Amino acid sequence: MKIFREVFELGNKEIILETGGMARQADGSVTVSCGNNVVLVTTVVKKSVADGTDFFPLSVHYLEKTYAAGKIPGGFLRREGRPSEEQILISRLIDRSIRPSFPDGFFNEIQIVATVLSYDGAFSPDILALIGASASLAISGAPYDDVVAGVRVGYTNGKYILNPNKQDLRDSDLDLVVSGTDDAILMVESEANSLPESVMLGGILYAHKHLKTIINSINRLAKVASKPRIEYSIYQINKFLKSQIKSQFFGEIKNAYTIASKQERNLKLNAIRKNVLEYIFSSDVDGNEYTEKEILEAFHDIEKDLVRSNILEGKPRIDGRCTETIRPINVKIGVLPGVHGSALFTRGETQALVVTTLGSDRDAQLVESLDGIEKCRYMLHYNFPPYSVGECGMVGMAPKRREIGHANLAKRATQAVFPNEEAYPYVVRVVSEILESNGSSSMATVCGSSLSMMDAGVPIAEPVAGIAMGLIKDGAKYAVLSDILGDEDHLGDMDFKVAGTRYGVTALQMDIKIKGISREILEQALEQARAGRLHILGIMNEVIKEHKEAVSDVAPQIHVMNINPAKIKDVVGRGGATVKGIVEKTGAQIDTSDSGEVKVFAKDKKSMDMAVAMIEEIVAEVEEGQVYKGKIVKLLDSGVFVNLLGSQDGYLPFSEIEQAGMKTNSLVEGQGLEVLVQNIDRGGRVKLSLVAR
């Protein structure tokens, strides 16, 4: 058993790549170690293309084992179940990083599995998994010539931090992951605290500069440990077939792409496709028999060439816009009467209905990970039903990877402006229902989420808007597109989503389909996105630019009280009897903590006020010189103890009672008296006198 090893440094941390010791029946197998973190990444490549496959079936699975952190899973079965949303997001991150490096037309199935075997809690294993995926591919024999690497970058006090640990990220204004090849950037994923575009661009370039060290190490490992290159074929469009279709139908296709409406355009194109199939099947084009798949692939290639060439030649886009024009926007808030907050955001043929719901601490999501159980106060969910694109399909199923990814992007975009628990004790759930989609539904979700939360009275620091940028590139010629359509995303070379406030960027997500882009293109895309974002924010601000001061009449009420910690036991009562009584009488939900914090959550203001008043009565402190009504709770030889505020007793001597003209032999327990607080000594003992009748 021969083991090969490569060692390099990343941000003053030693990273070790090793192959030959584990999972040797996989085509590629690499362990990546940093400190006590160990990730095993395997690659298996099918040696032939499955019948009927007309796409690249790459699948990436990132898995965390609880034993890696010395823990036993929860649940009845006590074993790992389906991947968490975080694991799915990391799987997508790896997939998006490596997919552009494969040749067009390569359709062999590839499966990559990254398994976290050991975890020290200091660093997230996601970057190790990404590096391991690239290394295992490089030695697997797959056609993977442009080796990819990825790094994370933070930004604190005006300085970039390479490979930050989790504590660094907590103090950082930026969490940026960049992947790419030696000479090109392929993928960007980030969350930021409204940073300027210049800082974001600087972070991307800083990250790319440090990829070379990782790539060189992977190449050295591949040089000594790589398997022979597999034999594979590349699917190619039949050029003669394409020319025949173009000669007969190009004029019709060209006219179809002048129709701005997506539905009308698709109806026209479907009719042309039907005619193309009939023409090819009924005529002896060149003596060959073509399949429907081959014909439609050639037709699609003509569409792609047409749309791209029109844009590069400066002609109007599919819907008649120029490269920088944003589609018409319509904004409405408060569109649903029975919810806590709502917004309907429409941009062209993309529409998001976004609803905000307020809840208490008990509604917070508990997220289990290798770090333990974390309470999540802000949830954002994204739903993409089939009717949004005029199709039939499965409804009510678990969210797909794409839906999870879009929800995460929108949440990261708005996380920077979301209030902390001290400022806003509510738990918030935002749901985006995509009602129509023709490009950029995730950015519509960002805009709608900001509007919906402001409508619900959530005190977000600033409104947030998002825009999706595209790219058409052919050699040295290129065009950056603002607010891309679905077809422009599908037929273009880049999907670059930018979200932020008027002050700066809060989230970036970039995916490239070509072999990377230059600094010049990045700068133009960021600047064009900034102009588009400010335009969208201006329209949103005309409807609502600050959160509503009060929550909706149908929203629950929440009140936070900070009382003397010693009084918590009085609020709770013996065996919880007191707090249960308040809950039963008012219908409110009450949470207490040993620090003295009491949270009261009620369905309406009346229940809230009643519960707060009852708690205030229990925890109220008596004051010298004040008169109180109390009840005798204990008789002594020299006087009586009188309960004043439910939780505090005072001593009333018989001499004071007699001085007020009352006979002491008539006193009984439970009898009501009106008393004056004469004195409270250092020990908290209260001396009373009787108020004369």
UniProtKB/Swiss-Prot annotation:
Keyword Magnesium annotated: yes
Compartmental location: Cytoplasm
Enzyme Commission number(s): 2.7.7.8
Catalytic activity: RNA(n+1) + phosphate = RNA(n) + a ribonucleoside 5'-diphosphate
Family matches, as Gene3D superfamilies: GHMP Kinase, N-terminal domain, K Homology domain, type 1, Nucleic acid-binding proteins
UniProt cross-references to SMART domains, sorted A to Z: KH, S1
InterPro entries membership: ExoRNase_PH_dom1 (IPR001247), ExoRNase_PH_dom2 (IPR015847), ExoRNase_PH_dom2_sf (IPR036345), KH_dom (IPR004087), KH_dom_type_1 (IPR004088), KH_dom_type_1_sf (IPR036612), NA-bd_OB-fold (IPR012340), PNPase (IPR012162)
The S1 motif domain, residue ranges: 625-693
Coiled-coil stretches: none
Known cofactor(s): Mg(2+)
The entry's keywords: Cytoplasm, Magnesium, Metal-binding, Nucleotidyltransferase, RNA-binding, Transferase
Family: Belongs to the polyribonucleotide nucleotidyltransferase family.
Description of how the protein assembles with itself and partners: Component of the RNA degradosome, which is a multiprotein complex involved in RNA processing and mRNA degradation.
Role of this protein: Involved in mRNA degradation. Catalyzes the phosphorolysis of single-stranded polyribonucleotides processively in the 3'- to 5'-direction.
Descriptive protein name: Polyribonucleotide nucleotidyltransferase
Organism: Francisella tularensis subsp. tularensis (strain SCHU S4 / Schu 4)
Organism lineage: Bacteria, Pseudomonadati, Pseudomonadota, Gammaproteobacteria, Thiotrichales
Gene it is expressed from: pnp
